[in-house]
Amino acid sequence: MCGGSGGGVLTAWIVGHTERFRAAVSMRPVINWHSFVGTTDGNNWYHQFRKYPWEDPLEYAVRSPLHYVANVTTPTMVMTGEADLRTPISQSEEYYRALKMVRKTDTLLVRMPEEFHGWRRPTHQLLQQLYLMAWFEKYRTQASKAAVPALD
């Protein structure tokens, strides 16, 4: 499974709650809602919560993918722009480091230099696709690989 921004949050959340997928890619995610509040350039996050994080820290914790990182067994790649102000790279770094510490699955952190919340440079757009294809190809089962005919 794969998602970016809000979809990146959902991807990280889902792999913390199921073993259904063979691989996942979480792009530009919010991983820790509590720390996100003080590092993002946006304020739309507040409409998803009833209170500020210092007023109800538990609500922010249970809605954060980081809270469920110990459950993740799906190989998960995390991809973010180094200059992203909407979902700062610190969110991706926090998740990547936690996945490494838990040691239950393979993980990779891809940092896009000088990129913001979307990739502006065509070379980075192409690079994203190459990373995605390589990651998902790596975790396809042998049976599904045999089912796909080779291109000549």
Language-model features: locations:
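Active-site-proximal cap/loop segments of hydrolase catalytic domains
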Residues: M1-D152
